[in-house]
Amino acid sequence: GSITLNPSFFKDHLKLNINAKGSINKNTFANTSAIWAASTMNPTIPVYSGLDTFGGYTEAIDNTGAPVNGAVMNPVGLLNMNDSQSTVKRFIGNIDADYRLHFFPDLKLHATLGYDYAQGKGSVYVPAEAAQNYTTSGLDYSYGPQKKENRLLTLYANYNKLVESIKSSFDVTAGYDYQYWKSTTPLYSEMNTLGEIQKTSKASDERHVLLSYYGRLNYSFNSRYM
């Protein structure tokens, strides 16, 4: 959902523009190996084997009954026996404020405040009998929450004046910008259906700050020369 407000105060000397948006996205990720498998698998081979092994899907097996290493796997099995999902929550908001001084209307003050926050977490489940993770007894783990944060502050003053007596106009701006980014991911382990760790991903914490100061002067004479 989203909301937008545009109030003004003090006889339009102060104008605000307020925006806020929130969202929840639920994602399902397919095993993309199914694309290659579908394009290369022998189309005359039946999808289902009629057996309980490998979830009932036909797979190339060796003399031990295990999937053949490097063989093309059943694309339908790759899709249906892989449950990978995530949920991402996000909020974006900003406020713009413009203020013209009552006693000095040629001077405008502006401020922008912005905030962007996202948090995501997910889970992966592949049953132990699936051919795609047969040697590791499947997968069963969760990860997250991964967090991203962005803050913005912009402040500037603008003076705009036309002096007809000397056929001149002045446009002066001075400002300041602050931006902050933060991205964090907690430590998590990929585990099989037996609770055994298969792989561990390290935690990460990245932060960046950007500061800017700026100024500008535009002068024009007789509406021709700048």
Regions found by a protein language model. Give the residues of each.
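Short, intrinsically disordered, charge-balanced linker/junction segments flanking boundaries
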Residues: 215, 222-226
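A conserved hydrophobic secondary-structure block that centers on an alpha-helix together
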Residues: 1-5, 100-107
